[in-house]
A protein has these predicted regions:
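Non-catalytic cap/lid and distal C-terminal segments of serine-dependent acyl enzymes
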Residues: 22-251
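C-terminal motif of bacterial Sec signal peptides marking the signal peptidase cleavage site
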Residues: 17-20
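Bacterial N-terminal signal peptides that target proteins for export
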Residues: 1-9
Length: 251
């Protein structure tokens, strides 16, 4: 009992420290426009969601924006400052929709894609699950998909296809998200619009692999490597070469 109490105290202190080090949420959520001044607006918009310790400008810093430009893709690109506090305070979905995606639609964007790494990949999948039909598609690189207990539950069941959430009662957030991921078993919900990439030695390779198993194989990109930017840059280049953003959300 004493050890359990000590563990709870340590977890509380860790959470308090994490919150104190995390930027505050704002209304509207912050963004950074990667489009060069004077360039005409495109019909396609790529929205980049940062990872746990990153900021909205990281995709420019790490070469993603430049690589997209070199690929010839015709798209405007915006980084969204969706840091950890938005998730912890349960503001992520509301702020992304009301401050970024709905205004983008009003401006006339015909195709809107979310691109996210790690925590951002989780955010992209979560938004797509909770707002069906809002997005043209998503790219999730090494997405975080929940705590080890949740992942173990799905794994013990034999994977996402064999796993079923308990019937009756309210599901917690993690079970709701995995139930949403399970919906990608239906080809019409993911074909040509849900793309997954991860390193085979990534710390999230097990849950990402279970998601990969229900997606069309041509929409899954893997290489050797771990949870690092060099891996993600290579996966991004591979996806750009495959012209994933030309699919228009169709296979």
């Amino acid at each position: 009992m004493t050890r359990r109490i000590l563990l709870l105290i340590l977890l509380s202190l860790f959470a308090a420290c994490l919150l104190s080090c995390t930027p505050q949420t704002t209304v509207p959520i912050g963004t950074v426009n990667f489009t060069r001044p004077g360039e005409s607006r495109q019909d396609t918009l790529l929205l980049f969601l940062p990872g746990l310790r990153d900021n909205s400008g990281v995709y420019a810093d790490e070469g993603f924006v430049a690589a997209a430009g070199r690929s010839g893709i015709k798209a405007d690109m915006i980084g969204v400052d969706a840091h950890l506090a938005y998730y912890l305070e349960k503001k992520f979905l509301k702020r992304l929709k009301e401050d970024v995606i709905d205004p983008a639609k009003r401006k006339g964007y015909r195709k809107i894609w979310l691109v996210g790494i790690s925590l951002g990949g989780f955010g992209a999948l979560w938004y797509d699950i909770e707002n069906p039909g809002d997005l043209t598609g998503i790219v999730a690189l090494s997405p975080y998909l929940g705590d080890p207990e949740m992942v173990d539950e799905v794994s013990r069941a034999g994977g996402l296809a064999a796993w079923h959430p308990l019937a009756g009662g309210d599901l917690d957030d993690q079970h709701r998200i995995w139930r949403g991921l399970k919906s990608y078993e239906r080809r019409e919900s993911c074909a040509g619009r849900v793309y997954l990439g991860y390193g085979l030695q990534d710390k999230f390779a097990t849950p990402d692999g279970m998601l990969a198993a229900v997606l069309p194989p041509e929409q899954v990109f893997t290489i050797e490597g771990g949870h690092h930017w060099p891996v993600w840059r290579t996966l991004w280049d591979d996806m750009l070469k495959s012209r994933v953003f030309d699919k228009d959300g169709k296979d």
